Swiss-Prot record:
<feature type="disulfide bond">
    <location>
        <begin position="223"/>
        <end position="251"/>
    </location>
</feature>
<keyword id="KW-0130">Cell adhesion</keyword>
<feature type="repeat" description="LRR 3">
    <location>
        <begin position="110"/>
        <end position="133"/>
    </location>
</feature>
<dbReference type="Pfam" id="PF00560">
    <property type="entry name" value="LRR_1"/>
</dbReference>
<feature type="repeat" description="LRR 5">
    <location>
        <begin position="158"/>
        <end position="178"/>
    </location>
</feature>
<comment type="similarity">
    <text>Belongs to the immunoglobulin superfamily. AMIGO family.</text>
</comment>
<feature type="glycosylation site" description="N-linked (GlcNAc...) asparagine">
    <location>
        <position position="362"/>
    </location>
</feature>
<feature type="repeat" description="LRR 2">
    <location>
        <begin position="86"/>
        <end position="107"/>
    </location>
</feature>
<dbReference type="InterPro" id="IPR013783">
    <property type="entry name" value="Ig-like_fold"/>
</dbReference>
<feature type="glycosylation site" description="N-linked (GlcNAc...) asparagine">
    <location>
        <position position="272"/>
    </location>
</feature>
<dbReference type="InterPro" id="IPR031283">
    <property type="entry name" value="AMIGO"/>
</dbReference>
<feature type="topological domain" description="Extracellular">
    <location>
        <begin position="20"/>
        <end position="383"/>
    </location>
</feature>
<feature type="repeat" description="LRR 4">
    <location>
        <begin position="134"/>
        <end position="155"/>
    </location>
</feature>
<keyword id="KW-0393">Immunoglobulin domain</keyword>
<dbReference type="InterPro" id="IPR003591">
    <property type="entry name" value="Leu-rich_rpt_typical-subtyp"/>
</dbReference>
<dbReference type="GO" id="GO:0051965">
    <property type="term" value="P:positive regulation of synapse assembly"/>
</dbReference>
<feature type="disulfide bond">
    <location>
        <begin position="300"/>
        <end position="352"/>
    </location>
</feature>
Length: 504
């Protein structure tokens, strides 16, 4: 019996050691149609740098971001994006595409980003970009574009960023923007092309938010006075497209490629432009002063009634009815813009864009709003309180006057003026001097006087032969009559007699 138990234990140990094949519990990993040598990660498909001359035949349907850059693609099949109904970004840069063709993007209605940069495209036809109604960013820089169809971008209603730099374009229509909607367009890069003629009135009529993102540097622009004044004003207003690339704005002084001069550094070329009128090129923006917490109303003033009105906020947000995403800005039925509670975020440039069949061209109106905090209001002046306070102070002063003891003046600290009740020492001195005086008064006064003045000499003063001298101590105290002494001396006023009383 024991050996059976040992045998069963040994068999269990052998089974555990051998294990079970993986194929029973875990099926082999599915490849999800991932092309050969490509990398598939969730909704990302990267086939970059593989030297592909054609697009892979099978692409995963869950792909949202497709990267086919740095290959050798020369053609794109019509409808090749039909299985990719979730596609949002397509990277076709650094290939050898020289043309697109009709229907290439017809099934990419959800595409947001299309990168066609660094190819060899020479033209864009009327239907090359059909089907891209949701496209927001189109990169076409570093190609060989020479011609753009008049309606090449007609179907791109949501396009906000268009990069056409580093091409060979000699002209561009700023009037209709080749079918683009100026309501959404925020960035238009036309730098490093061959633009030799630009309509200044068309430039001036563009919305302010598009001027801020219009890049025209490194083009052989003409040294035109009106164009110079316009770009100079943009530079002074701080538009980033001009301010950030001011050193790269050049113009041809003598219509020769070798005569390029820098717009903002060599102003001698435009010395004669001071008399050229620069007014009327742009409609001046209106400056508004708003206080935090107050309400603000902006109106889109147009020459004739407009069919459609849209606004662009300082944060580059397109505003249509009912208003902004956060609800702080409302667009009303008449096209006006209302802010119920102004905050610091509402400071900046608000642009109104009006379109309609009766308007010869799109009209814009600009408001430069500055937001300030309200000053604290001063407290109201309380006359009742001040009256009560004045009465209390007056009562205290009256009580002090009636019941407070008189001021005992110190001779050095307090100098109070009091009329003396007794004759002062100076008065006594004056009286004695008048008594001792030998000058007889006038005759009438002697007759009128019936009084006799008698002076008795002290016994100790008899040896002075009747001569007395008035002397004042060094520290003469005006308020101590005892400090005044009569001294004998040789200089007396007069000598009248010796011992005995003297009568005068």
């Amino acid at each position: 019996m024991t050996w059976l138990v040992l045998l069963g234990t040994l068999l269990c140990m052998l089974r555990v050691g051998l294990g079970t094949p993986d194929s029973e519990g875990f099926p082999p990993r599915a490849l999800h149609n991932c092309p050969y040598k490509c990398i598939c990660a969730a909704d990302l498909l990267s086939c970059t740098g593989l030297g592909l001359q054609d697009v892979p035949a099978e692409l995963p349907a869950a792909t949202a971001d497709l990267d086919l850059s740095h290959n050798a693609l020369q053609r794109l099949r019509p409808g090749w994006l039909a299985p990719l109904f979730q596609l949002r970004a397509l990277h076709l840069d650094h290939n050898e595409l020289d043309a697109l063709g009709r229907g290439v993007f017809v099934n990419a209605s959800g595409l947001r980003l299309l990168d066609l940069s660094s190819n060899t495209l020479r033209a864009l036809g009327r239907h090359d970009l059909d089907g891209l109604g949701a496209l927001e960013k189109l990169l076409l820089f570093n190609n060989r574009l020479v011609h753009l169809d008049e309606h090449a971008f007609h179907g791109l209603r949501a396009l906000s960023h268009l990069y056409l730099g580093c091409n060979e374009l000699a002209s561009f229509s700023f009037d209709h923007l080749h079918g683009l909607s100026a309501t959404h367009l925020l960035t238009l890069d036309l730098s490093s092309n061959r633009l030799g003629h630009i309509s200044v009135p068309e430039l001036a009529a563009l919305p302010a938010f598009l001027k801020n993102g219009l890049y025209l540097h490194n083009n052989p622009l003409p040294c035109d006075c009106r164009l110079y004044h316009l770009l100079q004003r943009w530079h002074q207003r701080g538009l980033s497209a001009v301010r950030d690339f001011a050193r790269e704005y050049v113009c041809l002084a003598f219509k020769v490629p070798a005569s390029r001069v820098r717009f903002f550094q060599h102003s001698r070329v435009f010395e004669n432009c001071s008399s050229a009128p620069a007014l009327g090129l742009e409609r001046p923006e209106e400056h508004l002063y708003a206080l935090v917490g107050r309400s603000l109303r902006l109106y889109c003033n147009t020459s004739v009634p407009a069919m459609r009105i849209a606004w662009v906020s300082p944060q580059q947000e397109l505003l249509r009815a009912p208003g902004s995403r956060d609800g702080s800005i409302a667009v009303l039925a008449d096209g006006s813009l209302a802010i119920g509670n102004v905050q610091e975020q509402h400071a900046g440039l608000f642009v109104c864009l009006a379109t309609g069949p009766r308007l010869h061209h799109n009209q814009t109106h600009e408001y430069n709003v500055s937001v300030h905090f309200p000053r604290p209001e001063p407290e109201a002046f309380n006359t009742g309180f001040t009256t009560l306070l004045g009465c209390a102070v007056g009562l205290v002063l009256v009580l002090l006057y009636l019941f407070a003891p008189p001021c005992r003046c110190c001779r050095r600290a307090c100098r109070c003026r009091r009329w003396p009740q007794t004759p002062s020492p100076l008065q006594e001195l004056s009286a004695q001097s008048s008594v001792l005086s030998t000058t007889p008064p006038d005759a009438p006064s002697r007759k009128a006087s019936v009084h006799k003045h008698v002076v008795f000499l002290e016994p100790g003063r008899r040896g002075l032969n009747g001569r007395v001298q008035l002397a004042v101590a060094e520290e003469f105290d005006l308020y101590n009559p005892g400090g005044l002494q009569l001294k004998a001396g040789s200089e007396s006023a007069s000598s009248i007699g010796s011992e005995g009383p003297m009568t005068t």
